[in-house]
Amino acid sequence: MPVRSLSSSVVVWPDRAAVESALRLWAEEAARIPELVRVGYFGSYARGDWGVGSDLDVVLIVAGADLPFARRPVAWDLTRLPVPVDSLVYTQDEWRGLDPASRFARVLAREVVWVWPPGERVVA
């Protein structure tokens, strides 16, 4: 979360590099769970226009899921990250089935920065 300087009233919010590094470390540990297929982020941190109070929008792709879409994020503890997190958890089939004509799918296609597996750039 934010860090207050001891000699100032200025609040310093974690920058993109710090947040991405923390997410990469989280993803490496979470990858021990075989259902996890991909981890990425989008939104203000991906676009570079984050600021004090910005959250991290995370997308997780999993092999399959028993929980309904709205309840899946509770299964993934992202509280160790240095900023608040809003997460979306899609199965591979749901991710592939996103309507490419929808505004949200276009935003995801344009913005998602994949951090796991290493070197991953796109999800087919």
Where are these regions (language model features)?
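Catalytic core of pol beta-like nucleotidyltransferases
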Residues: 1-38, 47-52, 62-124
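Short beta-strand->loop micro-motif that forms the acidic, two-metal-ion catalytic signature
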Residues: 58-60
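Short, conserved active-site loops that position catalytic residues or coordinate cofactors/metal ions
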Residues: 54-56
